[in-house]
Amino acid sequence: MIKKEIIILCGPTASGKSCLGHELAKAYDCEIINIDSMQVYKEIPIITASPIQIYNTDIHYHLYNFLSITEDFSVIKYLKLAAKKIKEITVRGKLPILIGGTGLYINLLVFGYNNIPDISEDLRVQVRNLHDKIGNIELWNQLKKLDPIASTKINHCDTQRLIRAYEVFMHTGKSIFSFHTAPKERILSDFNFKIIFLNPERKFLYKTCDERLDKIFKDKAIDEIALLKKQFTPEEYAHLKAVGIKEILAYLDGNLTLDAALNVAQMRTRQYAKRQVTWFTHQIQDKTILEYSTQEEFAQILRHLLFILRS
């Protein structure tokens, strides 16, 4: 059986993924699927630089800005939605292009995931409330009695993993690590992935990061986050990790000047981009790497990609 192909266009923030993907989609009548964990939320298209906020064309974009921040969502739910969209697009005879920089989503989509059952929102709330009441150390002590294997592998200071392990045991009666040792499930085993990694020269990347944040701050991002603050409680948007939200909230609360908020957001964006480059460099082995250090070289990338797609 000949496997169908999927293009994944990945790389650090502000590396030009959306621009290149848009041009490829126009040239080849492709459809674009989001693979960024923050661009799924409909309340924050500006601060996340959502391409459907930027491009107004007939190109089909999927899984962008479709979800409210209060809706229950998980990486497994994302994978199932993405797989459904990919299959629908290929049935129509078109090529799907996935664009984003969330390494976890890309890794699990390409290489498979441990099939841990979904945790109900009610149970998740119960465990979070328990944690808020008793704290990390006591929750870790309870986990040790229920799941001694997990307690030896999870530090009591690692709140996220601690809560997750406790949730999984309460839901399944099994250690979370029993799922880790089981064979991984590949949701798209009948597809081939062609991974293209955009890797700009560091100085050029940092420049584009700064320019993007400057543009975002001028492009009504302040109003967007002010509305978020007005419509939702801090608990409801605490899980939003997009750079710029925390800094704008500090500005709105009078704790930072606007210039200081922008400077901090730019610094954090550069740090985030550096971490993304490190992750993609070491975690994704089978990939095509496209490097550039100027706008002129960046313009040549499209021609290179068109050649790759023809090969």
UniProtKB/Swiss-Prot annotation:
> Site: Interaction with substrate tRNA. Where?
T102, R124
Q: Which GO terms describe its molecular function?
A: ATP binding; tRNA dimethylallyltransferase activity
Q: Which Gene3D superfamilies does this UniProt record tie to the protein? A: 1.10.20.140, P-loop containing nucleotide triphosphate hydrolases
Q: Which UniProt keywords apply?
A: ATP-binding, Magnesium, Nucleotide-binding, Transferase, tRNA processing
Functional note: Catalyzes the transfer of a dimethylallyl group onto the adenine at position 37 in tRNAs that read codons beginning with uridine, leading to the formation of N6-(dimethylallyl)adenosine (i(6)A).
For this chain, the family text in UniProt reads: Belongs to the IPP transferase family.
Subunit: Monomer.
* The protein, known as: tRNA dimethylallyltransferase
